[in-house]
Amino acid sequence: MHLLVATAVSVERDAVARAFPAPGTEVSRPGITLHRLPDGWDLLAAGVGPARAAASTAAALTAAALDGRPYDLVVSAGIGGGFAPEAPVGSLVVADAITAADLGAETADGFLPVTDLGFGTVTHLPPAPLVRAAAEATGARPGTVLTGSTVTGTAARAALLRERHPGALAEAMEGFGVAEAAAAHGVPVLELRAVSNPVGPRDRAAWRIGEALAALTDAVGKLAPVLESWKPHER
């Protein structure tokens, strides 16, 4: 298996790397720097937000294809907000749907997703057998992970998202961008989030970033054997 794990920032990438005993090496490719681990794992701090994450992931996918060793799976991983009470701080969520929370248009009758306008997609579905296996291995709860360009900071916005996306368990800023790039290359995608804060009013004192990063490291350690043994045709 050749795997790409895309995080937003370097502290998340480093949390993933700590799940592996062997050190990695830095590999430069046009526009990106990969942290390459043994056994076919490449880690990428892809940047914050869906656009930057999509661009960086696409660059990594293209470089791998040109090198003659395309990726078999792309994983969007990191910390994120959790919708209480289903996804409390410190818990894990694995996406059974990766959804753009706000890609569409506002109308007098409410929000219309871009698909209702006749364009694109708003949801990518990771392989269901892989989602189940990941949930069993890590204890993560499967559910929708939303991607937005703006982090929720009010109770009103959190309630609106819950109304619009009833199956949502977590919110982050990169998963949909990573999934769009993977889909363009025909590569399956998975998203794993460790919950660092509740989705709702912005209260930095309530954030538990260190706890979430530790949970991410632990989860990746448990997930690695599942991913390494997974066959891409098992979709």
Swiss-Prot record:
Record note on disruption phenotype: Mutants require menaquinone for their growth.
Signal peptide (residue range): none
Protein name (Swiss-Prot/TrEMBL): Futalosine hydrolase
UniProt pathway annotation: Quinol/quinone metabolism; menaquinone biosynthesis
GO CC terms of this entry: cytosol
Family in the record: Belongs to the PNP/UDP phosphorylase family. Futalosine hydrolase subfamily.
This protein's record includes keyword Nucleotide-binding: no
Biological role stated in the UniProt entry: Catalyzes the hydrolysis of futalosine (FL) to dehypoxanthine futalosine (DHFL) and hypoxanthine, a step in the biosynthesis of menaquinone (MK, vitamin K2). Does not accept aminodeoxyfutalosine (AFL) as a substrate.
SUPFAM superfamilies: Purine and uridine phosphorylases (SSF53167)
EC number of the protein: 3.2.2.26
Entry keyword set: Hydrolase, Menaquinone biosynthesis
Cited CDD domains: futalosine_nucleosidase_MqnB (cd17766)
Catalytic activity of the protein: futalosine + H2O = dehypoxanthine futalosine + hypoxanthine
InterPro entries named among the record's database cross-references: FL_hydrolase_MqnB, Nucleoside_phosphorylase_d, Nucleoside_phosphorylase_sf
PANTHER family the UniProt entry points to: 5'-METHYLTHIOADENOSINE/S-ADENOSYLHOMOCYSTEINE NUCLEOSIDASE, FUTALOSINE HYDROLASE
UniProt GO MF annotations: adenosylhomocysteine nucleosidase activity; methylthioadenosine nucleosidase activity
Recorded superkingdom: Bacteria
Keyword Chloroplast: no
GO biological process: L-methionine salvage from S-adenosylmethionine; menaquinone biosynthetic process; nucleoside metabolic process
